């Protein structure tokens, strides 16, 4: 008789090899064809909502690992919240306006911007953006992200643009919108403003100069020893041509500055830079007369060295960006020619001088000496003039990375031009208070955005481009007065509802304005339109109003925003500002931020370095579930590492989790809910109640409850790496290495319908059910595969994603039982080490070939005695004997109260279960079997 065929061996069609790249598309098709997202929403209609508002990715390229991380984090949260009973509508979005798309469209399509009328260019951009929306949508869906993919929000949609106009109008009517000056990147060769996306950096040789600025107001800080001598602040600049626009000198408030005697004069500069400046300028700067903290010089004054500027004052201001990395610690400040200079200028209400025209030539405002010179050609003349005036302390040429126009490859400049702004001062206090009402995850995000909003200056919201939502302002042809009010905003918004923002270029001002509109200043009836468009951050910053507040399935304010940590400066802030300005509160109740994706060494990914990993390649090799597992395994609060080795390790973790589940499926193969076969395990009638289970099975279910507690807490606090480690440990250590290994004999060798086997099967089924729900938000494809393989009641949900969250069964938790088994597991690991040593020494083959004598005393003795009846089974040996006290020749363990002797098992080996026993041979009908196995095969 072939006794192997009488064993209850595991049997399942659930494949050992996942084959995720090939199988996952089948589940995408299943979810889509069966409208699982729609059915989920219908099932939870009327439940409390949890709205996670999607930060719109930019529609101009393939998704990268940062996109994948972000979308999967959102998906994990939404799937968990659904299982907890929430109504979880998820509307994905896209950002589709702005310069990157405009330039990408021009470049890809080979267009000449100057030869296209605005509407033609806009239509090209429109089509280009939607093409990338489709590509990205498919990539996001491939990651297993569930949402309303057929009805996303897109910033170029008519309804979105109309609502954006209304947000702008509300802010304007409250007095928060005004026109002023702002420095922008400017290409003198292309004669156009540029965005950061339109610049690239290249090496350039630049003359740097150390300039003596006569100090005329010292705040009483000049040391006694320096009084009576001519004093100068020494500034440093890499752009000598901007000297005509100098209106301030910036110091770091915390730096120590020195008053130094040099050649009969007193020079003021950072103490830590004296040696460096002295070496470059060939000056002895060792005679320090005194020191002053930067903050004590705030509002002191210098005078511009050029006499033709009529003693124009240069204010001493404070700026944290001033460092001792280079220069003098006294920074030349020209708000008309620098972004940080401009911000400093706004803070101190400095004049914004910009004596440069659109072609990069210095104007009359720079003085007759420099008028008409191209900016970079003026560097040497400025340097020579300063030398003539005895105001040049020194100079040197340096090579550094400098911004160039991506189009013409020439160096660019900063240039102040007229722009539209949102005034933050009008609602700054409200915004800061609103920040305190939001939950920030991690908590440091609160202080970060608080500092940014507290320190930020007015928001420049205009761009000199065509592809975007226009600034809805009209100008009177007669007097130049600008016109924007509730009536004009309503009219423009209504046009946009019908035709989109193309209407601004397709219709005249008179057509767009309400009939009978006249200039409130002069009564004029003819108008022209503003040519600037809005900053794309105003687009996405209006999305909470245009989407969450408008779509009936959503709600406002939303429960959560979730994006990368760079969005404290970006979308989190633009959304906060528009929301507070319009509605008086933050648009979100919580904000979660994650770090950047970097390589395995913590370096930024770069094509030139060759360390770029893209989601598409990972999916082809491993499948999307491995990316999802990587997302959950990462502590996203810091930068998140990824590398081929990390992915390989995660694939191994995935394999272990999958094998644990497969083992349970295989050993519950006779399980069913509705069956007439008496040999099958009918869960309704054959499940063993908890209090009747074998104690080891009770232990397993108790640990399942503890796992549920830990995993639920981790989901609630968004600490997904905690639940990853908890489930991984549960599957590999508590289940595979301990519980499932021990019950193998019970499952295989006991009669199929024995209580011992049914007890284990009941426990395993409950473990499997809870595991697939806990893992479904992370391993969405694999858990769907498991669910489809499982035998279920007729009324079971068609998708694993519809299952409710498993409740913790507190009655299963017994501290005494937990302590008992935790203590035994610790002792068992010591015994297992000795058995492994015996195996390596060829003393035994399999552990069932062994008899162990356990020489124990004290605590170890008590623990072993508590499980003495099942000790051999628990150790997976044929015999286990407890001997009180120590023994000569026994193998020492990591415990002083336990030694182990391993010997060959006594008796004969049962052909069916492989356990050695004196009972083998006692049954004449089955002489090679032990008593238990003989009884099992007779039935």
Positions of the model-derived regions?
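Residue patterns forming the tRNA-binding/recognition surfaces of aminoacyl-tRNA synthetases
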Residues: 2-13, 17-20, 26, 30-34, ...
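Protease-associated
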Residues: 248, 255-330, 339, 343
